[in-house]
């Protein structure tokens, strides 16, 4: 890449974020794999000579590590999907008070339409609740540009800054014209008392934070205004802007918000004063709509446009022009294929597990989430990462009090166990619980693209590292009944489950297999290297 001139690339939003982080002097990146954000960190490995990028065990650790890098004077980024922000909320809320040293960006990749998640929470609310500025790009060029804006704003106000992506922005490709390189950004360590938020200091930090947000709101110039002779004005942001432009072209006035929190209050008032009617077009919750109404401005939003799933030009067109012919058909034929890949040990394991009837199965988030599908029907409940064991504990304790003979089986993968299952297991040990807990160890974070984790022995950039031994870890937690088995072997799987069901106490089974896709990928790469 030439460092002295601008270049043109065709990039996804995720690729643009990674490139911009490199060009703008970012040096530390941490995150946890999760669609649609995964490819950001994977692309940062291209710049391993300049950037330290890593998979963290979970999102909380990723944010805390990025805070540490910022404190040390290094520009940093923490990357996660929307539900990951729930895990990282504790440090996020406090670092807004203490502020940062070198620029700190937190990526939240939201999933309107629930393409690969368990919910479609709107993380714009985190910006308001945690009092952290938030950018929302609409395309890959803006993903690239907003990293630069975010770092400047972060360091100007000593605040972390959110960049909110959505699935379509993350994975859609568009032209990106890059700026010149400006790397080698490093600040000295800031040892001021604000980084020790005891109550007497925190109350002052909160007051300072409110003043910062007010100043940002009054000086916010991160918007695009398109004025026409129309008396209709639309306020929008992110991917919704693209849909608005496709439907209306230049026939209405548009105020596109790039920094969606805090709002550019003066510009919003000025724009609305020129229009006879104001409409708000946004995906999911009425976040912008409520903020505009709080300014005393009459506007129309979710009265016409749904507050669930993602938008598209057809939905917006129908909201404004109700009588439309040729409505797109939603009669998509259902798939009848098995939910797991050919050769995956989940086929054998869940085939066996589904034959056990007097059990309740508490599952988790991963490829095994699809065990509820035919022909297995081997899942009763799943909530979030790490909950498989915790919920199993709660159910089993309750059934025991009710003198039920049902046993509860908790399931999770190896990566999920390292993410947030360890504390759930400790809870079972500490509170003398007796569910059957099964770790499906396929040596991979497979559902998000076969990434490594603390149990694989390799880092994000494929360098060898210390491998966490699950059996030794469980033994150190004083788990008395530990058994490993080969889940590709039907007889071993049956024997392991029967063994666990005979014991009226806590049992942890480890299915020691491998991801067939990852194995095939590794074999192909090895053959290519040897060619």
Question: Which sequence ranges carry the predicted segments?
Answer:
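Short beta-strand segments
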Residues: 79-80, 105-109, 162-166, 235-236, ...
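Flexible, low-complexity linker and terminal segments
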Residues: 2-18, 23-24, 137-340, 345-348, ...
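Short acidic, glycine/serine/threonine-rich loops at helix termini
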Residues: 40-43, 67, 88-92, 114-121, ...
């Amino acid at each position: 890449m030439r460092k002295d001139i601008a270049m043109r690339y065709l990039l996804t939003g995720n690729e643009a974020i990674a490139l911009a982080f490199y060009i703008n002097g970012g040096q530390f990146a941490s995150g946890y794999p999760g669609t649609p954000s995964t490819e950001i960190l994977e692309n940062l490995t291209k710049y391993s000579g300049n950037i330290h990028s890593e998979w963290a065990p979970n999102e909380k650790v990723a944010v805390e590590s990025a805070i540490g890098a910022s404190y040390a004077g290094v520009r940093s980024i923490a990357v996660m999907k929307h539900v990951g922000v729930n895990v990282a909320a504790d440090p996020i809320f406090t670092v807004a008070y203490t502020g940062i040293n070198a620029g700190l960006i937190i990526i939240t990749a939201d999933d309107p339409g629930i393409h690969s998640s368990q919910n479609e929470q709107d993380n714009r609310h985190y910006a308001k609740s945690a009092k952290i500025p938030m950018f929302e790009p609409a395309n890959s060029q803006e993903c690239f540009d907003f990293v630069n804006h975010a770092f400047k704003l972060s360091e100007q106000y000593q605040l972390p800054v959110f960049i909110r992506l959505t699935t379509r922005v993350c994975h859609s490709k568009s032209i990106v014209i890059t700026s010149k390189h400006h790397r080698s950004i490093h600040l000295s360590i800031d040892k001021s008392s604000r980084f020790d938020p005891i109550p007497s200091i925190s109350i002052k930090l909160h007051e300072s934070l409110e003043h910062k947000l007010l100043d940002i709101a009054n000086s916010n110039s991160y918007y695009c205004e398109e004025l026409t002779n129309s008396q209709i004005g639309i306020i929008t942001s992110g991917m919704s802007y693209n849909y608005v432009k496709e439907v209306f072209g230049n026939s209405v006035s548009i105020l596109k918000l790039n920094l969606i929190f805090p709002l550019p209050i003066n510009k919003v008032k000025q724009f609305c004063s020129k229009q006879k009617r104001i409409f708000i077009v946004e995906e999911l919750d009425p976040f912008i709509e409520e903020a505009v109404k709080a300014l005393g401005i009459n506007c129309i939003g979710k009265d016409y446009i749904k507050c669930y799933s993602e938008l598209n030009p057809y939905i917006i067109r129908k909201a404004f022009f109700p009588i439309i012919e040729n409505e797109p058909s939603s009669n998509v034929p259902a798939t009848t294929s098995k939910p797991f890949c050919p050769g995956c040990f989940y086929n054998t394991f869940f085939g066996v597990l589904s034959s056990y009837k007097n059990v309740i199965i508490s599952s988790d988030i991963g490829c095994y989430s699809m065990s509820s599908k035919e022909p297995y029907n081997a899942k009763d409940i799943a909530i979030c990462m790490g909950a498989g064991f915790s919920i199993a504990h709660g159910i089993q304790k309750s059934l025991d009090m009710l003198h039920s003979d049902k046993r509860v089986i908790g399931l999770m993968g190896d990566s999920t166990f390292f993410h947030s299952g360890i504390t759930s297991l400790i809870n079972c040990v500490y509170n003398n619980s007796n569910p059957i807990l099964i770790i499906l160890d396929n040596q991979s974070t497979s559902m998000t693209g076969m990434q490594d984790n603390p149990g694989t022995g390799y880092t994000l950039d494929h360098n060898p590292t210390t491998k966490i031994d699950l059996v030794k870890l469980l033994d150190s937690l004083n788990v008395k009944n530990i058994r490993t088995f080969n889940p590709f072997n039907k007889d071993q799987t049956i024997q392991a489950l029967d063994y666990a069901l005979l014991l009226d106490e806590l049992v942890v089974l480890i299915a020691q297999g491998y991801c067939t896709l990852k194995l095939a990928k590794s074999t192909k790469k090895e053959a290519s290297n040897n060619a």
